[in-house]
A protein has these predicted regions:
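Extracellular/periplasmic catalytic domains that process cell-envelope and extracellular macromolecules
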Residues: 42-45, 56-58, 78-79, 86, ...
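Short acidic-glycine-tyrosine-enriched beta hairpin
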Residues: 92, 98-120
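Conserved short histidine dyad/triad with adjacent acidic residue
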Residues: 59-79, 107-108, 117-119
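Ligand-binding loop in jelly-roll beta-barrel domains
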Residues: 109, 119-143
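A short, N-terminal "cap"/entry segment at the start of jelly-roll beta-barrel domains
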Residues: 14-62, 150-158
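Glycine- and acidic-residue-biased ligand/ion/polar-headgroup-sensing regions
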Residues: 69-72, 78-99
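Sec-dependent signal peptide recognition
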Residues: 1-7
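Short beta-strand His + acidic residue motifs that chelate non-heme Fe in jelly-roll/DSBH
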Residues: 74-76, 94-95, 116, 121-129
Length: 158
């Protein structure tokens, strides 16, 4: 399950200037501060990120964990940078296109990998089922999130 996660991290770490030593068990990761408004996240309420390395808003390598609650749909969007992702837990339903299309979703169980090509018209979308999902994402910032349809952009909480 974590083999793909480790291979992804090893690949991108080779391009990083200085990767610090870090060891965190799942309970330590979940117990540390999570941010719902992190750059490069969907911006949806309930979706949280944990930055493992770097700063997604700045130039350079970054690594984040994305925590997505059950029954969440993320509409078609893209990111400025190329990103590689590994499903850590849960079943992630993922697809490419300029609008959400349930017929274009592929079920990705833990250990699955996928790409998020940046700077192109290759938008992507996702959905969770009855369980929450954790995804590990690596990229070279700065990153952003641009929704294909501006009406799908999450609105700030009032």
């Amino acid at each position: 399950m974590f083999k793909a996660f480790i291979l992804t991290l090893a690949y991108v770490a080779l391009r990083a200037e200085s990767l610090p030593q870090m060891r965190m068990s799942p309970s330590e990761v979940r117990g540390s501060a999570l941010d719902g408004s992190q750059v490069g996240s969907s911006g949806l309420a309930g979706v949280h990120t944990k930055v493992l390395f770097g700063d997604p808003s700045k130039a350079g390598f970054y690594s984040i964990l994305l925590f997505v609650p059950a029954h969440t749909t993320i509409q078609a969007h893209s990111h400025h940078d190329d990103r590689m992702a590994t499903v850590v837990s849960g079943i992630w339903s993922f697809g490419y296109g300029d609008h959400f299309d349930a017929n274009n979703l592929k079920l990705l169980p833990p250990g699955s990998v996928y790409s998020e090509p940046g700077g192109t018209a290759h938008n992507h979308f996702a959905r969770t089922g009855n369980d929450s999902v954790v995804v590990h994402i690596c990229g070279f910032g700065p990153t952003d999130t641009r929704y294909f349809n501006p009406a799908d952009e999450p609105k700030p909480a009032k």
